[in-house]
Design a protein with these regions (language model features):
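Acetyl-CoA-dependent GNAT
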Residues: 8-11, 15-24, 28, 36-99, ...
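Short coil/turn segments at alpha/beta junctions that flank glycine-rich nucleotide-binding fingerprints
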Residues: 103, 120-123
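Extreme N-terminal starter segment of soluble prokaryotic enzymes
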Residues: 1-2
């Protein structure tokens, strides 16, 4: 398996896996019209190209034999979805294709985020996770994340609650 940093030429493949993994994760527990509105607004080709070109955001694919298994999106500084300190690093998205869940791929991507945080001498890694995504919450707790707040996440017309979790990044 390899982790590869993306650039704007990866936008089509990023859009494809972003939509697929978001649907696999959430479509059974949300209304289709809310899902579609979110996908249209947040995972459009134009939006993803813009995010790929933002110097304060980074995307990574995890690949095996040229197949994308999942991806990671990190935000630094002003790209963070909450107004946290500059020494925080946000995991905005970490998604794995359904067929590859339970194979430690999420842990590999999480370790990549921690490695980047260490290299940039950042203090905390943080994320928002839907309060009903129990599998993800358990994963983050198992990996040392602690709850520190909440924020709203809008999926179409549905205003949901994300739990905010953070992990102190140990210095090199």
């Amino acid at each position: 398996m390899q982790i590869r940093k993306l650039n704007s030429s990866d936008s089509e493949n990023l859009r494809k896996i972003s939509i697929q993994t978001f649907r696999e994760t959430f479509e059974e527990v949300n209304y289709e019209e809310d899902m579609q509105k979110y996908l249209d607004e947040n995972l459009s080709l134009e939006r993803l190209k813009s995010e790929l070109e933002n110097p304060d955001s980074e995307f990574y694919f995890i690949e095996n034999k040229n197949k994308n298994l999942g991806y990671l999106k990190l935000n630094f500084g002003n790209a963070q979805t909450e107004n946290f300190k500059k020494n925080y690093l946000e995991i905005e998205r970490i998604y794995i294709l359904k067929d590859f869940l339970g194979q430690k791929i999420g842990k590999i991507l999480l370790n990549k985020a921690i490695e980047i945080g260490k290299k940039k001498n950042l203090e905390f890694l943080w994320l928002g996770v839907w309060e009903k995504n129990h599998r993800a919450i358990k994963f983050y707790e198992k990996n040392g994340f602690k709850f520190f707040g909440k924020h709203k996440f809008v999926l179409g017309k549905d205003v949901q609650t994300d739990l905010l979790m953070k992990l102190k990044i140990d210095k090199l």
